[in-house]
């Protein structure tokens, strides 16, 4: 799907992930174990939600491994995006990426808008608006004449700032899948429209479908932890062609080198 390719580009991860269902009904015990591992991998991150003051991350340590250089305190990368098909063959995608460098206690990033087309020969039309974080507020660095867009950027909130996953341990019997050729894992859960996170997303974004979403937990990399891979969550409200609607959230901790 074109949107997935675009999402990978925005977070500077140039890896094509092929999702292949890896666990059958005849291997129920193994599937249950994999679900427990996926949930355990997400627990430390989701326990941080809601991160009401993003600047608290300057003092928050994350998973460290040999990829970190000596003395590097690491950088937190946040992304929240909303994708929706508003016309046939086209998906409007917008969101914000923020890099919080713990070494210099500075956070910079950008808000982006993009149109992803189905046609093979059409490229994405993307615009970026640079921002920084000061006193837990988004400060727009570029001149934006569109007052509606300007207000949207300056008042942007990451999903991780208002999400609440205190009931996460109660999520059970997910649809588990993994890839055979790369370390890639997914757990999907059908979520009710009465869920507090779903209600909040419907308040924040123009989600027109009344369908209840599927929550997907995705891991790219070692399921036990890795600073090279990443984890993201997705609320998928519709996968129907020309009705695609999804919200993605990404909170990652990694080496500061190469992050900008």
Curated annotation (Swiss-Prot):
GO (cellular component) term, any one: plasma membrane
Lipidation (N-palmitoyl cysteine): 23
Entry keyword Signal: yes
Disulphide connectivity of cysteines: none
Domain of life: Bacteria
Swiss-Prot/TrEMBL keywords: Cell membrane, Lipoprotein, Membrane, Palmitate, Signal
Lipidation (S-diacylglycerol cysteine): 23
Protein name per Swiss-Prot or TrEMBL: Uncharacterized lipoprotein SAS0399
Native source organism of the sequence: Staphylococcus aureus (strain MSSA476)
